[in-house]
């Protein structure tokens, strides 16, 4: 599969979230908030909650904390 055709790219999104796991958790939680009635923070043509959430991450519209590596 050619990821260069996907916008935003998974590589770019991983750079913002740290890893794929965090990307999935962040976007799925935000998608659930949108489904529950929260207003989208971006104006895009899609009405799919996950697509909106992905674009919000890409456009730095949502805040999240990256986990600290290791356990003390």
From Swiss-Prot:
Q: Which Pfam families match?
A: RNA_pol_Rpb6 (PF01192)
Keywords from the UniProt entry: DNA-directed RNA polymerase, Nucleotidyltransferase, Transcription, Transferase
**Enzyme type, top EC level:** transferase
List the Gene3D superfamilies: 3.90.940.10
Domain of life where this protein originates: Bacteria
GO annotation (BP), single: DNA-templated transcription
Q: Name the chemical reaction catalysed here.
A: RNA(n) + a ribonucleoside 5'-triphosphate = RNA(n+1) + diphosphate
EC id: 2.7.7.6
Any Gene Ontology CC annotation:
DNA-directed RNA polymerase complex
Q: What GO molecular-function term can you cite, just one? A: DNA-directed RNA polymerase activity
What does the similarity note say?
Belongs to the RNA polymerase subunit omega family.
Which protein are we looking at?
DNA-directed RNA polymerase subunit omega
User: What would be the name of the gene that encodes this protein?
Assistant: rpoZ
């Amino acid at each position: 599969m050619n990821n260069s055709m996907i916008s935003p790219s998974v590589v770019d999104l991983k750079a913002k979230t740290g890893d794929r796991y965090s990307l999935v958790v962040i976007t799925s939680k935000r998608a659930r908030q949108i489904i529950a009635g929260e207003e989208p923070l971006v104006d895009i043509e899609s009405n799919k909650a996950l697509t909106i959430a992905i674009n919000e991450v890409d456009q730095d519209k949502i805040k999240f904390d990256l986990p600290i590596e290791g356990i003390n």
